[in-house]
Amino acid sequence: FSLPLGVLAQNSDSYTFPIRPNKSNFLSGTMGELRSSHFHAGIDIKTGGQIGEPVHATKRGYITRIKVSTYGYGNALYMLHPDGNTSVYAHLNEFAPEIQEYVRDEQYKKQTYEIELFPQPYQFAFKTQEVIGISGNTGGSLGPHLHFEIRDAQQRVLNPLHYGFKEVRDNIPPILQGFAVRPMDIEARVFNKYERADIRIDRTAFDYKAMDTVKAFGHVGLELWGHDKLNGSANKNGISIIEVEVNGETYYKQDIDVMSFGLQRHILVHYPYDVKRTEGPKYHKLYVEDGNKLKFYETTNQNGLLKIENNKVYEIEIKMYDPYGNKSTLDLIIKGEAPKQFLQESIDFELDQIDYRIKKDILKIYTSNNCEKEEEEELNLNIGGTVKTIKPSYFLDETA
């Protein structure tokens, strides 16, 4: 697996770090972190918990957009560069004096504090490293910092760390926090159950290994929870680059290095919402579900799902990278084990004895009744006054 071309790009000398150029800097947020409703765009640069750091133009260009808002990016500048990219500087406390005066005049003219302006080309032109504003804590910021982005000509967000800024040091590989295997259809099983299973992990340095052989059958999906750290910072940042190999063959890759704002809400199908809702952590699905239109995946024709066959052994290696090329790995073995199916005796249920859940095209029924198991019983469903008879695909006695 060779790192993407963007990683440690060779054009690092054409862009300057916007805070304290040529000095050590620290980040509180990185590209692609999983937030509740979106992926984090760009990077968040620490300013020592203070307002007032000079913000420098990352490359020569001119201001194309100015926004003043009490939410979101707060006071923000957008600068177009000769290569067609746009840099974004958000949560500013002040703009450069000439911009500040222009904004104030327009606010008075329009009798509004919140304003969005589009200056003429070269009306506010700056050279590389010239000060364009002062860092702040405006808008939806939760603490003083500079939010910084680089966007391409289509306004897609690029990962700024792919520009090789030497001001940020990172020799720490990603850290694994959790791993799970999920059955993906009604015929699939993990440890003979139609349930998502958390896998126990052992760690040696940054090499991780599953403590148990995973017994599974049918189509299953892998899910990973972890974070990345950078030198000198306690923040838990996101893991953007993940690769899955099965018996030496690449099944899945993700590299969150380019992001379209129009697809941000698809994060809700990138992470397993049921786990986030009940347990809190946001795992990466290492497979692509129906309806997911995000563009940063490479998968097999199974969309990253594994088809586990009875008695076959699958050696799996999962590689996690950060933009600086640091790597950690997880190794596990999945062995195919056909399910031991048994069905519930058909009985009449009292309303207070049953519950049910529907996920996709699967109906799960829960009952507190204790009854004998028989192989050929059926289930009668009353749907809108019509009785439909079906045979359950799976039965689990949780009292056994």
Question: What spans do the regions from the language model cover?
Answer:
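Surface-exposed, glycine-biased beta-strand/turn segments
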Residues: 9-86, 95-98, 112-122, 127-128, ...
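Histidine-centered catalytic micro-motifs
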Residues: 92, 143-150
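A structural signal for beta-strand and strand-to-loop patches characteristic of beta-rich domains
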Residues: 165-174, 334-350
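Compositionally biased low-complexity segments at domain edges in trafficked proteins
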Residues: 173-198, 344-372
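A solvent-exposed, charged loop/short amphipathic helix patch at secondary-structure junctions
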Residues: 103-114
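Long, low-complexity serine/threonine/glycine- and acidic-rich segments characteristic of extracellular
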Residues: 169, 184, 194-339, 372-373, ...
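Short, solvent-exposed beta-strand-terminating loops
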Residues: 84-100, 186, 254-267
